C-alpha cells in the first residue's frame, strides 16, 4: 500500500508538469528560457508604461496598467525538458482544475514555469521579490513585491506554493469582476482588518512610485503619492469616515466606467 501511494503521488506530479505525454510517452517540456519568459509574463503587473490614474490603481490588482502579454501556446514546446526534484508536491491536476478556471494544458504550462523558477515547489518572500524586480530594473520594487506576495500567501505561512499561485492567478485572470475587486481590496488592505486606511493606501502608492523609479519620472513631486491617496479617498470613502470598506470599494468601482473597462485588461491573458 505504501509503495502504491508513492507511485500515485509521482504519477500526479508528472501528469501536472507535463513531464510525459500520456499518448506518446515523450516529454514535451520547454526550454528554461521559454519557461522564464512565460512565468514572468503570468505575474500581474507586466511592464507598465505609466504611473496609474486613480481608476487604474483601483482596477488592476498590481495597481498598474499592464500590457497584454503574448498568448501562451501550451503545444509549442521543445523536447529537452529536464525534471526538477521538488520538495513540495502540488495537488493533483484534476483537483486544481476544479479549484481554478484553468484548463489542463494551462495548468501544465504554469507548473513547468513555476517549477523552473522555484525548483523546491514553493517560493519565499525574498525569491518572490527577486523575480519581481526583473520587471522594474529602473526602480525599487521590493516593498510592492512584499505587498503582492502577502496577497498570494493566503494562509500566511511565509511561502507561496503552486496552489497559492494558480489560485491567485485564476481570480486575477478568469474571475468575475467582484472576484477581482475583492482580490484587489485584499491587496490594499495591508493589515487585513477589513478596511483600507489612508496610511495603508499611502504605503501602497509610495511603493508604486518607488517601483517606477526616478529615471522614469525624474520631475515627480514628493507630495504626488499623498495627493493620489486623497483622490482615491474622495472617490471611495462614501460616508467620509476616513476608511474605505469592501462595500464602498466594490460599489464605487462598479459605478466607474473607466475602472470596469480597465478590469477587462486581464481577460484572455493566457
Curated annotation (Swiss-Prot):
Residues where Ca(2+) 1 binds: 153, 155, 157, 159, 164
Domain EF-hand: 81-137, 140-175, 176-211, 224-259
Residues with lipidation of kind S-palmitoyl cysteine: 45-46
Top-level taxon of the source organism: Eukaryota
Positions that bind Ca(2+) 2: 189, 191, 193, 195, 200
Binding site for Ca(2+) 3: 237, 239, 241, 248
Gene Ontology CC entries for this record: cytoplasm; dendrite; Kv4.2-KChIP2 channel complex; plasma membrane; synapse; voltage-gated potassium channel complex
Modified sites of kind Phosphoserine: 9
UniProt entry keywords in alphabetical sequence: Calcium, Cell membrane, Ion channel, Ion transport, Lipoprotein, Membrane, Metal-binding, Palmitate, Phosphoprotein, Potassium, Potassium channel, Potassium transport, Repeat, Transport, Voltage-gated channel
Assembly, per entry: Component of heteromultimeric potassium channels. Identified in potassium channel complexes containing KCND1, KCND2, KCND3, KCNIP1, KCNIP2, KCNIP3, KCNIP4, DPP6 and DPP10. The KCND2-KCNIP2 channel complex contains four KCND2 and four KCNIP2 subunits. Interacts with KCND2. Probably part of a complex consisting of KCNIP1, KCNIP2 isoform 3 and KCND2. At least isoform 2 and isoform 3 can self-associate to form homodimers and homotetramers. Isoform 3 interacts with KCNIP1 in a calcium-dependent manner.
Record protein name field: A-type potassium channel modulatory protein KCNIP2
Annotated source species: Homo sapiens
Gene: KCNIP2
